[in-house]
Amino acid sequence: MSSLQMSEMSKTYQYRKVMKPMLERKRRARINKCLDELKDLMVATLESEGEHVTRLEKADILELTVTHLQKMKQQRQHKRASGDESLTPAEGFRSGYIHAVNEVSRSLSQLPGMNVSLGTQLMTHLGQRLNQIQPAEKEVLPVTAPLSVHIANRDAYSVPISPISSYAGSPNSNTSSTSHSLLTTIDVTKMEDDSEDEENVWRPW
């Protein structure tokens, strides 16, 4: 091996010997900087959740970060499974409210001898409350669960009662009426009076 080659190898060796510690220090500095930023983020997150952390080691910071990311992943998967990933908190509340109203209507339909007038008043009240939390520019799915009741011990009538029908008297009824087919409230008293008139009609036979 010539002296020139020995000289070049020596220079390369010296360069690596000098640069390797410098690169290592830079790498450690980057790691420490990222860990400090993670620490600040995790401390702020834990404090917002009601936990107070006084001291965190590097391993603790990494463990808390992994746990927090796993928790966020589970929440995202749950939202995706329930179909509410794109809903805002207010939209999620309205969606849950409509679901609850549907359940109320379904439960009322299973009550024997349910008073239609009382059921209509209840569903109208729920519809008015829905109208108060419903923005004018948004639309909601109408609640159209049928309410089956018995009138004067006759056959059961299936009365579709919807809180959307209460929009007719609300300030936003113009926009609601164009986007929804409003269900007319049934005058139960008139139905009962008509049935009684049929029974009381005098017939010569």
Curated annotation (Swiss-Prot):
Q: Where's it found, cell-wise?
A: Nucleus
Motif annotated as WRPW motif, chain positions: 202-205
Upper lineage:
Eukaryota, Metazoa, Ecdysozoa, Arthropoda, Hexapoda
Outline the subunit composition.
Answer: Homodimer. Heterodimer with dpn. Might form higher-order oligomers. Transcription repression requires formation of a complex with a corepressor protein (Groucho).
**A Gene Ontology biological process term:** neuronal stem cell population maintenance
Pfam families listed in its UniProt record: Hairy_orange, HLH
Signal peptide range in chain numbering: none
Instruction: Output this protein's name.
Output: Enhancer of split mgamma protein
Task: List, alphabetically, the CDD domains matched.
Answer: bHLH-O_ESMB_like (cd19741)
Q: Record's PROSITE patterns?
A: BHLH, ORANGE
GO cellular component terms given for this protein? nucleus
Arranged from A to Z, the UniProt key words for this protein are: Developmental protein, Differentiation, DNA-binding, Neurogenesis, Notch signaling pathway, Nucleus, Transcription, Transcription regulation
Query: Found in which tissues?
Result: Expressed in sensory organ precursors in the wing, leg and eye imaginal disk.
